[in-house]
Amino acid sequence: MANGIDKLPRGIRNKNPGNIKLGTDWDGLASEQTDPTFCVFKESVWGIRALMKILLTYRFTHKKTDVDSIISRWAPPSENDTNAYIDFVCKEINVKPLDKLDNSIEHYLPLVKSIIRMENGQQPFKDELLVEGMYRAWEGYPTGSSAS
């Protein structure tokens, strides 16, 4: 690829910064899925939306509200060094593994950024794009500290 996109991390190339595996018919998927393992999205905002949708499912369906339980499900030991991932995220967002996160942009934006950084070795997105994708995911979900 002449524009250097082939040198970008896989998740950034695929517009899937959470490295979400194929299997769900996500909104915003590219018409051509060129990666045999991971989803390819039309635009990064859709990959960010999918990442946040998963985190909201963890919160509201599986009652995962702290970094330890969220990352243990996101990056299970069968595929990852889960403890190192948890440590990385906790340092990035300055919380302890069992600190409960509020269902708010103030808590989830840093979490999403740290997941993207861990998955790709970088976090190249502006906050505005991240927030747009996150709010697309939040449609229909409650927000705020009382939302569990």
What are these regions (language model features)?
Residues 1-148:
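Cell-wall polysaccharide-cleaving catalytic domain and substrate-binding groove, primarily
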